[in-house]
C-alpha cells in the first residue's frame, strides 16, 4: 500500500510539472507547481495563472464531482476553481462549473469571442 501511495505522489508531481510547462508554453509564464506537502494546506496544484485555482489530476478513472468539490473547498475568495485532468494517451481536459464559464464568456468582448471561434474552427471536422 505504501508503495502505491508513493507512486501516486510521484505521478501527481509529474502531472503537475507537465501541466505547468504546458501553461507556460501557452503564455502563462508564471505557472508552476504549487508548494503543497501533504495536500491539506489549500494551495492549488498549479499556481501562477491569475484568478484561477487549478487542481491537477492524472488518472484513468474520472472522479469529476469529487475533484470539483476539492477545488471549490480549497479556492481563495475571488478565484475561479477548475480541475484540469488527463488520462493516458489523451489531451488535457478542463472542468469548470457552467455558471462560472458563463461569467467568463460574458466578460469577453465580441472581438475576443470571434478570435476564440476562429482559433477552434479547425480543431473539429
What is each stretch, according to the model?
Residues 1-125:
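Catalytic phosphate/metal-binding cores of nucleic-acid and nucleotide-processing enzymes, i.e., regions
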